[in-house]
């Protein structure tokens, strides 16, 4: 296996992919909200990889190779990312690029 990409690079890649795909996968109001408030409240956070990903992708997840990133808006009162616009599973292996996103649905 090749060297895994850093968690910082995973977050950057996830955010770039999110920005590219958000207009096609989120409600227009959510895109406007995220764009308007990202400067003050936006976040892309690495979180513990959820055990539910196998249900979404159909294969077992090696938590050393795959990382989960959540992208959304932080609640200013408690500094918690509680308005999640997307969850992304992304491979850290540069030889086997993969990502799968779960989008916010109203």
UniProtKB/Swiss-Prot annotation:
Species of origin: Vibrio campbellii (strain ATCC BAA-1116)
Q: What does this protein do?
A: May act as a double-stranded DNA (dsDNA) mimic. Probably regulates the activity of a dsDNA-binding protein.
Coiled-coil positions: none
| Gene3D superfamilies with a match to the protein in the record | dsDNA mimic, putative (3.10.450.140)
Under the heading InterPro entries, the entry gives: dsDNA_mimic_put, Put_dsDNA_mimic_sf
Which is a Pfam family this sequence falls into? Answer: DUF440
* Record's protein name: Putative double-stranded DNA mimic protein VIBHAR_02752
**Family assignment from sequence similarity:** Belongs to the putative dsDNA mimic protein family.
Q: Which SUPFAM superfamilies match?
A: Putative dsDNA mimic
């Amino acid at each position: 296996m090749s060297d895994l990409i850093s968690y910082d690079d995973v977050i950057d890649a996830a955010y770039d992919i999110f920005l590219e795909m958000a207009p096609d996968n989120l409600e227009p109001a959510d895109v406007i909200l995220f764009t308007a408030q990202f400067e003050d409240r936006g976040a892309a956070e690495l979180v513990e990889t959820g055990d539910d990903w196998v249900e979404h992708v159909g294969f077992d997840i090696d938590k050393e190779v795959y990382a989960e990133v959540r992208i959304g808006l932080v609640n200013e009162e408690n500094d918690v990312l509680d308005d999640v616009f997307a969850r992304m599973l992304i491979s850290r292996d540069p030889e086997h690029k993969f990502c799968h996103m779960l989008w916010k649905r109203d």
